[in-house]
Amino acid sequence: MCAAGLAAAAAQSVYAFSARQLAGGEPVSLGSLRCKGLLIENVASLUGTTVRDYTQMNEPQRRLGPRGLVVLGFPCNHSGHQENAKNEEILNSLKYVRPGGGFEPNFMLFEKGEVNGAGAHTLFAFLREALPAPSDDATALMIDPKLITWSPVCRNDVAWNFEKFLVGPDGVPLRRYSRRFQTIDIEPDIEALLSQGPSCA
């Protein structure tokens, strides 16, 4: 196990973790989302796919939120330094630059943090240990080694912005998707998950 995963090794589900929303306030315990299907993505506001990916993240939250889906975004600057804004600047960047046009995320957006390396948020250390590679691209790696800005480097690292993790209502990670697998294409998996009903009584 990579050292970054040791802190999260004892966890059985994502409900063991918490994070602070971008808007501030007290940390949100993911345990408060028990019995929901979760779609977790690492995001960046200056990526070449920011417009597509952020707008696609709004769609499942809008359509499937009433049925029990919660979409969570975690800004990170690891991949190409494409989230170099401060926490207080990110929402304005999304609203006026990319995607722009007054865009506002309708999903939970958390404070900027790390998804790889020794400083990785324990949630992402847990997700990476539970699902070591994207299901659609088991060989996914950072394309350009010069862009690796964290240490230690592990085989299960998140390779780029907008990797996705689908988590069941029991808090157990089910599937990981690469940056190339669009959020909109995950909807059949989400629909199938939600149609099973809660399994976390």
Swiss-Prot record:
Enzymatic reactions: 2 glutathione + H2O2 = glutathione disulfide + 2 H2O; a hydroperoxy polyunsaturated fatty acid + 2 glutathione = a hydroxy polyunsaturated fatty acid + glutathione disulfide + H2O; tert-butyl hydroperoxide + 2 glutathione = tert-butanol + glutathione disulfide + H2O; cumene hydroperoxide + 2 glutathione = 2-phenylpropan-2-ol + glutathione disulfide + H2O
N6-acetyllysine: residues bearing it: K86, K112, K146
Site (Subject to oxidation and hydroselenide loss to dehydroalanine): U47
InterPro entries cross-referenced by the UniProt entry: Glutathione_peroxidase, GPX_AS, Thioredoxin-like_sf
GO molecular function per UniProt: glutathione peroxidase activity; phospholipid-hydroperoxide glutathione peroxidase activity
Catalytic residues in the record: U47
Record carries keyword Metal-binding: no
Modified residues (N6-succinyllysine): K86, K112, K146
Keyword Transferase set for record: no
Enzyme's top EC category: oxidoreductase
Sites bearing Phosphoserine, chain numbering: S32, S195, S199
PTM comment: During periods of oxidative stress, Sec-47 may react with a superoxide radical, irreversibly lose hydroselenide and be converted to dehydroalanine.
GO CC, one annotated term: cytosol
EC number: 1.11.1.9, 1.11.1.12
Keyword annotations from UniProtKB, A to Z: Acetylation, Cytoplasm, Lipid metabolism, Mitochondrion, Oxidoreductase, Peroxidase, Phosphoprotein, Selenocysteine
Family listed: Belongs to the glutathione peroxidase family.
Free-text function comment from the UniProt entry: Catalyzes the reduction of hydroperoxides in a glutathione-dependent manner thus regulating cellular redox homeostasis. Can reduce small soluble hydroperoxides such as H2O2, cumene hydroperoxide and tert-butyl hydroperoxide, as well as several fatty acid-derived hydroperoxides. In platelets catalyzes the reduction of 12-hydroperoxyeicosatetraenoic acid, the primary product of the arachidonate 12-lipoxygenase pathway.
Subunit composition and interactions: Homotetramer. Interacts with MIEN1.
The protein's name in its UniProt record: Glutathione peroxidase 1
